[in-house]
Amino acid sequence: MPLLRLSLVLLLLSPALCAQVAKPTLHEATLHEALLAAHADRAGDPGVATAFRHLAKTYGTPLYIYDQAHIRGQVDALHAAFAPRFSKLRILYAIKANTNPVVISLLKAKGLGAEVVSRGEIETALRVGYAGPEIMFTSSSKNPGEIQRAIELGAVLNVDSLDELGQVQAEARRQKKQARISFRINPGVDPHTIHQINTGIAESKFGLHLQDGIAFKAYEKAKGMPEIRIEGAHCHIGSQITETDGYVLTARKMLGLVKDLKEKLNIKLAFLDLGGGLGIPYEDGQTLMSPEDLAKALEPVWKEGVAAAGYEPTLWLEPGRFFVGGSGYLLTRVNTVKQTPLKTFVNVDAGFNTLMRPAMYKAYHRVRVIGKTKDPQLVDIAGDVCETGDILAEARMLPRAEAGDLVVILDAGAYGFSMASEYNARPMPAEVMVDGNKARVIRRRGTYPELFRNTERATPTKH
């Protein structure tokens, strides 16, 4: 065990220092330690391989694995950075990142509220014990049933347009209630992230624009509606944001709106939600802004804006990926290895139906071959979906893999299972949660009969 403890210390050292220190081989490891070791590029060590093989044998592949300790640690890190600097603080979890009820329950137990984007996510939040008033409902296209449900529950409706405001007013009048609302604001800020998840730019479909006073006029209109209770302002400029500049500019603009609403309309907001979007490292050696970096950058802007407004709303934050992304591992098994005149394909038993991000966003995920360290070769990790674009990782130098080997894809805890599908009539993967050296199924594997669960039984045709 002393050797194991030394190895774990080395896992936490800086990459530069680790390069100078001989790293003892991990001959045994708990499941949690094996997950950490895979992140530290130690997936070839015998103890790590034993742990992953145990998971594959017990639960099958493809398999989503989540590290409970990582999720808790991320919440603690964000709270430790912001709580000392912002006395009025509320943190929510963006449920769309990972909708598994056990994951959500873990975050609820850490004191987080729920940010949802659909009726299904509303019902998921209720299922794990959230009360309606603890929920913020954000969507750019809410249907009448969703608006009705949110008002019934007393959730905060994050209104995206004047058209929606009218619908919310009408439904609140029908229910003889006051609808709790904030407006989603488009601040016109480019956070320099992937285009498909860049939501703060002017051409985005999200929010009421600050420019030309559009957002201000929405508050002015809502103030005259007795069915509406204005509670806050919201913005979310994008996801996988790696620098503080976009947040600082957004905060400055949003606090300017807070000041204008107070001075010109006598509207005092209970909260200002700056959204989520904190990025995580998807590549080895990648250095991003930390929660501490972001909190330090926002603190002076917040204090200045609050002083100018003459009061302090509660700061709301709503990360998703930051909490769960790094906790997730997609464990797959190699079906075949195929060499062509141009490439070598390692074909695994998962595809973009299992992990959509590489195909949809050209997203990069680190890949490890379990239990292998020798004979590296340049390969593409190809999925089992019948599409040319089903490549999970392209042009990676990895130890030589063979049929039956295990390959793990890292940082798959956010927008992994939650974006998965049954395309190509392949059942959904299982999900397990690791706590120390224990694992438990938190979603069982889909079955072939379930592929037909909502269809009418067809009568066989005779020829």
Task: Show the residue positions of the predicted features.
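Short acidic, glycine/serine/threonine-rich loops at helix termini
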Residues: 103-104, 127-128, 147-152, 168-171, ...
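Conserved, mostly hydrophobic/aromatic
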Residues: 71, 96, 118, 150, ...
